[in-house]
Amino acid sequence: MSFAVTPAELLSTFGLTGVVHFPRYESPDNRLDTRTADFLSQVGLPHDETFNSKASAGQEESILLTEWFAPDDGILPEECHPWLVLGYFAASVISLDPHTGKVYAFGEGEPLNTYTQLHRDVESLVHALNLFKKFREHQSDAQVGIDEQVEDLRARIHAFDVIPFEDDQSPWNLVLDEVIEGIW
């Protein structure tokens, strides 16, 4: 199976300690769709200051979304109960619907029923994170203004997956606005 981001490319961008792989196994409890499971075992998830994977070594919190939020956070919608936590990105808990492979964001401090779809799948999430990491490493090298650089990055992410920019308040729109404002 081929993916938009190769294992070698992800390792080159994030380094040996910046990629988390998941073992691929067959069992009745393995609820991941095949493409997602293959991607996570072959390519992996980044783990750095931008995206903090919950599956990295030493993580003691559960990856089950139902165990993630406290009662004070509100009631988790029923459709979200089987979802898994992938990590943190832009003040949001990032979760995975294991049946569809879709990736969702729960904004920090937001009502739980206001979650939004962030990416069509894990591959798209990792593709965008990979592009963002490369952008951050080279943004000061470019002769073009920051606005143009951000728009180029937005177009490259959008060409692969339109979902990250459908909502004006999506984590990706907020992050790229912060880059333009000089916060990142």
State where each predicted segment sits.
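A surface-exposed partner-binding patch
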Residues: 1-100, 158-184
